[in-house]
Amino acid sequence: MYKTFAAVMISTLMATIAAAAQPASTAPPEVIKDLAPTGTLRAAINAGNVVLVQKDASGVHGVTVDLANELARHLGTPIALTVYDAAGKVTEAVKNGEWDIAFLAIEPVRAAVIGFTAPYVIIEGTYMVAADSPLKTIADVDRDGIRIAVAKGSAYDLYLTRTLQHAALVRYPSPPLGFEGFVADKLDAAAGVRQFLNAFAKTRPDMRVMPEHFQEIREAMGTPLGRDAGLQYLKTFVEEMKASGFVAKSLQRAGQADAVIAPAEK
């Protein structure tokens, strides 16, 4: 079965709240049917992105968790959070009907099965290399014989798969395993979210993160394709959360104030 503790989830959090304790929903019935067809809003949380999700002994926190809970409050439904350790696993899980909403970067491959809102946060994808590496710029990396560690199915994996002309990608199950593989397998570079790479490099003075970026990763909310009423509601919800300062305040609480809030969708 695809959904296993070891291969798919870091953990599963059930944050189910009695419906009677929820405020009355102002959402139309067709929206609730799309976003909570079981009566519970099932939210997929990608713990592979440290900008959006932070973990501690009490569970998961961060802007995606805050947005999921706020959406459930708007809908007047209970909520169940399922935590995955990589974005690629969230995308795979939609095929099994495991979630109703997710927080993923907008990518063409994902858009074949997921309807996306406009982004709420924009983060950078870049490279980490050895401190003494001859690779100095983003352009230097795309050369014959260069091997790059990536988390399988991540936004940067999908982007680099489309755009690289010469370098080869070496895929690992999750971002942490990708960085471990980069070191253990003596690869030339590791791709990832800048904040995650910076945190890793701080513990490894023999590593450095490139100041340039190869990708602006547009983080958005999504729902399985075909839930049109639900998607339109999500689009409005995301714009409201950006305009009200909800997203900015959530990121600040999470220690991610340097993340860039996406502009309003025109």
Description of each model-found segment:
Residues 41-42, 76-78, 95-104, 145-147, ...:
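Alpha-to-beta junction loops
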Residues 47, 122-129, 194, 198-239, ...:
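Periplasmic-binding protein-like
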Residues 81-92, 135-136, 170-181, 217:
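Short helix-initiation/N-cap motifs at beta->coil->alpha
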Residues 24-29, 62-74, 133, 139, ...:
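Extended ligand-binding regions for polar small-molecule ligands
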Residues 40-47, 61, 139-154, 168-169:
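Short loop->beta-strand "edge-of-pocket" segments that line small-molecule binding or catalytic clefts
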Residues 120, 129-147:
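Flexible hinge/capping segments at coil-to-helix
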Residues 88, 105-113, 159-162, 183-184, ...:
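A ligand-binding cleft/hinge motif common to bilobed small-molecule-binding domains
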Residues 23-105, 110, 244, 253:
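Extracytoplasmic small-molecule ligand-binding "clamshell" domains
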